[in-house]
Amino acid sequence: MKQQRVLIWSKSVSDFFDGNVCGIGVQLYFWAQTFTQNRWEVSTLTSHKSFIHENIHFIHYRNWGKLEFFFFFLAILWNIVQLHPQIVIHRGAGRITLPLAIISKCSGVKFVLFSASDTDFETGRELIAGGSHNRRMWHKAIKWLQYIIVQNQYQHDMLKSKYGKESLILNNVWGHVNITRKNNQATDVVWVANFRRLKRAEWFINAAKVMPEYDFTMIGGASKQDHGYYEEIKQQATSIPNLHFLGKKDFNETNSIVANSRLLCCTSTFEGFPNTFLQAWANNIPVISTVNPSSIISKNHLGIVVETEESFKLQIRKLLQDDRLYSSISQCVNHYFSINYEMTVNYNKLVNFVNEKQDS
């Protein structure tokens, strides 16, 4: 039987191995793992020379600078012709989606788009760099799409309402991760995110100030769009004795720190589905969060959902002090995670969705 091929159109997996961790990179890496385990040949992009690592083929893709968009079409066409993939995958909103969708369709290749944020289908709120013309290209791209994977019910409903498009709600996948447990890494409360103002890191800082009896840890790198915010938060954090500002850490280091914590906090104004939740739940750790995708936290007792900064502080203290409540939530996390984030189950859902849509 001829080996099936998938092309992941992103440099995020390569960035992941370089230690530049972001949610898109983590998820695309685990999807690459999933496809290789199911005997697909997996290719993706890199700024480095072409190489193979963990059975993933990394293809050199140069940066064309200001001329890059004009070479998108040629580069996409060239790689599709050379690799003959059955599936092309891309994640997140952006102008590149349009040439990917057009060339894939014209080449008879199934193009699968994974959403990355709740704003992906909110007209005018998409997190797309550049001018309004980039948003218009994204809007046109959606009309070309046949296979769309969303992270939660809100994204599903927005896509249906705004564009009349159906989609599959699919859990993020989570592969095997080696965890190092060290007593000197132990912390009570951890916050993990790239520093952007929409993440509201100041909530976490203010919580640490009023709870000096607990250890707080912040992990994350600066955002290209908001580097000043990183420096602002770092300066505030250094003046708080019980708050450890670690800055950027690689994926394995972050996992070990989360695994040695008691609570994970999310203070974002909006998200798609934070991978940090999975880092916590894989270790039976509850979350306290301002986002609740598809009501997953409240429905399954996986943590506590808050709306205000005052409630955020109160619930941190409550969960750290109430051993019975903590144990109850931790048990629910263990049960829910073990049956909902298995890689093979989600792989089969994806493949069945693509095949059924093709046949319909």
Model regions and ranges:
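Membrane-proximal helix-turn-helix segments that form the acceptor-binding/catalytic region
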Residues: F30, L77-W78, I102, C106, ...
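Nucleotide-sugar donor phosphate/pyrophosphate-binding loop at the beta->alpha transition
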Residues: F71, K110, D120-K140, W144, ...
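Short hydrophobic beta-strand element within catalytic cores of glycosyltransferases
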Residues: A282-T290
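An aromatic- and histidine-rich active-site surface loop
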Residues: V88-V109, L113-S115, T119-D120
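Short, structured helix-loop element that forms part of the nucleotide-activated donor/catalytic region
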Residues: D215-N242, E253
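Aromatic "clamp/platform" in nucleotide-sugar-dependent glycosyltransferases that forms part
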Residues: T269
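N-terminal subdomain of nucleotide-sugar transferases
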Residues: M1-S50, K209
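Conserved donor-binding/catalytic core segment of Leloir-type glycosyltransferases
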Residues: L7-W9, R181-K199, I205-M211, F216-I219
